[in-house]
Amino acid sequence: MVWIWLGVGLLGGTGLASLVLAISLFTQRRGRKRSDETSSRGRLPAAASDKRGACACCYRNPKEDVVEPLDLELGLMRVATHPPTPQVPRCTSLYIGEDGLPIDKPEFPPARFEIPDVSTPGTPTSIDRSPSHCSSLSSLSSSTSVDTVLHQPPPSWKPPPPPGRKKRPPTPPVRAPTTRLSSHRPPTPIPAPRKNLSTPPTKKTPPPTKPKPVGWTPPVTPRPFPKTPTPQKPPRNPRLPRTVGLENLSKVGLSCPCPRPRTPTEPTTLPIVSVSELAPPPRWSDIEELLEQAVQSVMKDAESMQMT
């Protein structure tokens, strides 16, 4: 509208500009009067009337004498924070029914942000709902109960748990001990290598032995018993000393003088020598001396054994 006035003023038509201004002022006043009439009749805006089953809050503006709808939380805050004085607007709870008109219910909503048990209709709250504040709305209220209009509680409302009962944590299941024997052996830890030191030799595990038969028994090894010392026995046949004649006989047989060289045609002939000529037989006196020496040696050995 302002742009229209400026355009008309620039064109120079002052009479036309004044006419347009008068028409605009008349239409604004007429629209304001119509809004006051509809609000005084208790009709809420289309946005609030479309919400069937919702709760609203309204108050009368003392300056313009208009009933204005407010949010539920804002109205409760006004009641909780401000005392009911004529200067402060008071809240009146409204319930929008099936026909789109507000229904005054004294039991809903309660004061102090508490939602009552709507299954039992009932208890009036501390909110002041005197008909002096909203006389036009109280005339439109019906006599229907809460159970017929409000079928279910608000979606965010949950009943409080009973006092003194707490949830017990579930007990873990008890496992029975296993009876199976596990053949799993933990691996042997490998020692860390040390610096400037030779690693110790690792023990080699022997190869697995073959299983022995069932009826096999190890061989019985005889136990070594201590031996008792036995006395030294004298020889039964004493050895006779070698005679000089036998030694000479062996030397003669090995070193035989050969005056002529051997020829393959002539056979080798050795001179025949008798034993009696080379070594005479031993005498009896020599044999007796040997026997006496042997007897004396045996007697000495026997005496030494007895002394020990």
Curated annotation (Swiss-Prot):
Region annotated Disordered, chain positions: 103-274
Intracellular or extracellular location(s): Host cell membrane; Host Golgi apparatus
Domain of life according to the entry: Viruses
Compositional bias segments (type: Low complexity): 132-145
Compositionally biased region (Polar residues): 120-129
Bias-annotated ranges (Pro residues): 152-163, 219-238
Keyword Membrane: yes
Any one cellular-component term (Gene Ontology): membrane
Signal peptide positions (record): 1-22
One of the GO BP terms on file: symbiont-mediated perturbation of host natural killer cell mediated immune response
Keyword set, alphabetical order: Host cell membrane, Host Golgi apparatus, Host membrane, Host-virus interaction, Membrane, Modulation of host NK-cell activity by virus, Signal, Viral immunoevasion
Function: Remodels the host actin cytoskeleton in order to impair immune recognition of infected cells. Mechanistically, interacts with members of the host WAVE2 complex and redirects the complex to the plasma membrane. In turn, the efficiency of immune synapse formation is greatly reduced.
Protein name per Swiss-Prot or TrEMBL: Protein UL135
Organism, scientific name: Human cytomegalovirus (strain Towne) (HHV-5)
Gene: UL135
